[in-house]
């Protein structure tokens, strides 16, 4: 695809990628290409990719199916879990409907129990994530889980995964990570060249671009164009620079970003799952492939592991590189691990970097938009 001269039009294309991807998925199914659905960045996409499958992020960012989910699940459960289950149960997510296999993971107790019910209407493989990532036993367990996933994928799709195919998938996925990282590193420029809303459109929309080569080329061209325009003086006005951390990006993050940027701030970076957490580190392309995969995915700084030094290290790196003025921690209601860890994040940000921090607990509804705007406006005014 040739680069459109109007950059906002490109950002909107990425924003619409999820809806447009529905037709692409139907075409993939008609061509007999397997589809693997996933909910988490801990899932090693390289393994199903090596079997010729396409990996898709499943719909779990809106509240429209939560009422149906609550017929089976507790009301006081994380909205991400209820939304994930609801979209699957109601067949309102075409990506879930067309998935031949869903790969889950034990990142939290609510999720792993939800997968038991999901398995009643969709083939589900659950990866057992170790609670700690600091010892050899945890690494051995996670490597074994990689091999168990390989076996499941091979049996499910009747396609043996060769080492060469896996190395090719690793190399391709690494190129995608680097292209995404180069794009969101644009937020390090000061003043920023684009808004956090536009960054979010591209980073989230990229998960629904299934032609990896085309995606990489488009990201590279767009990044070069934005950087060139910034060097020519096309920059946003100086404002307080905000880093978002916390729960996975989705409907909740979108309204938080909107509140920040409508009240005088710019979101310049995302530490969340769809942002730096997933793409900043690549898989080693030498040595044992499963050791390399285990090492990369165990390095993800998620609140479900303890201790979670990786998250603190990533935050410190981003606070410095993005010249951050304040940190906003987005916590989904009833997400206990991120809620409990918020104290450690607050201490780290304030004591190690001497910058303001605010924790925002929210869900996928719009009921708190007014209150959210008021709190965010007061926070930014303080900056």
Q: What are these regions, as identified by a protein language model?
A:
Residues 47-61, 68-69, 243, 247-320:
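Redox- and metal-dependent alpha/beta enzyme cores, enriched for Fe-S-associated oxidoreductases
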Residues 2-34, 147, 151-279:
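A charged, amphipathic alpha-helical module
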Residues 8-9, 15-29, 33, 37-41, ...:
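Metallocofactor- and cofactor-centric catalytic cores in central/energy metabolism, strongly enriched
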Residues 35, 100-101, 326:
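Structural motif
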Residues 85-152:
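Acidic/His-rich segments in extracytoplasmic proteins that coordinate ligands and/or metal ions
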Residues 76-92, 303-317:
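Glycine-rich, highly charged phosphate/nucleotide-binding loops
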Residues 3, 343-383:
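Peripheral docking tails and interdomain loops at the edges
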Residues 306-352:
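C-terminal hydrophobic structural anchor segments
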